[in-house]
Amino acid sequence: INICFLDNRVVGKTHLTISLGIEACKQNIKTRFYTFKELIDLLTVTDSKEIINKTLKQLSRIELLIIDEICYSAITKEQADLFYQLMSLKYEMKSTIITTNITFSSWGESFSNKIVSAAIIDRLVHHSKVFKITGESYRLKDYKTEKSLNIRQS
């Protein structure tokens, strides 16, 4: 099963996924956490097809892969293709948890390829629980509290 956390604000999606990852580790579930940028960098660190395929296989074997901040910045078509390959390898085999700040309908712009983004979304949401997180930004809440207390920075 996959889990997708969606919202365009800072409401604690990352903290929630980290907590789920910690609980998975306590259950002896092999878990890895990456930001989307870190994951894409890992997949594109080399031009060697052999190393890329080895990395894809290693990542696909992880029982719970947590990917934070999908689509916070645009990626190239080649990077999108590699991410698609990873999601295809994991599809119906291992679990993935993602966070994103944009709707699925906007992913095509970030992935530079609407067809690939649709295929990735299809694999992620099939057998998935999708949660739209609502609420006030934790960071803005803290800022408002500090402001109301007249805390001054020196």
Residue ranges and their predicted role:
Residues 15, 26, 59-60:
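Short gly/pro-enriched beta-turn/loop segments at secondary-structure junctions
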Residues 64:
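Walker B motif beta-strand of ABC-family P-loop ATPases
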Residues 21-34:
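Post-Walker A helix-loop "phosphate-sensing" segment adjacent to the P-loop in P-loop NTPases
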Residues 1-16:
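Walker A/P-loop nucleotide-binding motif
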Residues 17-20, 86:
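Aromatic/hydrophobic pocket-lining residues that form π-stacking "cages" and hydrophobic walls in ligand
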